[in-house]
Amino acid sequence: MNYLIVPGLNNSGPKHWQSFWEKSLPNATRVIQHCWDHPEKADWVETLVKCIQQLNADTILVAHSLGVCTTVNYLLKAKSQGGVPPYIKGAFLVSPSDVDNVELIGNFAPMPLENLPIPACVVASENDPFLSMERSEFFANAWGVKLFNA
């Protein structure tokens, strides 16, 4: 199994859990965006598309924060254009950014609210200062996936 790490705003530093997973998991790679601090939805989604097109083996998408919004936008775009590649087996969506309520990432709004075309889960926590559990539950329900409280 391969793992494609999809970081959020400002990437994930060396002590971030995504960086740890990238180093610890066999066959893990990271999406590298062109501009981490001034994200543009179309650019971020297109970069993810290009990374996915380079894959050729079963892969789990591991997204965090704005990377979740990028991943959800990609999945629904792919769904509407013939489907997600069969080697994309699932998505691990951690602490989605609330793009509808944060000015810096507002060009990602609105958050897509459709069932995802692949197995996925949302992982959130009650002490997340950026996203309430209620909002996390709202996203998970809209995407048709299970929510885990970490």
Report residues per predicted region.
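Conserved loop-alpha-helix segment in the C-terminal half of the alpha/beta-hydrolase fold
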Residues: E22, E126-K146
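Flexible "cap/lid" loop of the alpha/beta hydrolase fold
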Residues: E40-V45, G83-V84, L93-L116
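Gly/Ala-rich beta-loop-alpha elbow adjacent to hydrolase catalytic centers
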Residues: L61-V72
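Conserved hydrolase catalytic core segment
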Residues: N73-G90
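Conserved alpha/beta-hydrolase "acid-adjacent" motif
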Residues: P14, N101-L104, P129-R135
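Short beta-strand/loop motif that positions the catalytic acidic residue
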Residues: L116-P117, C121-A124, D128
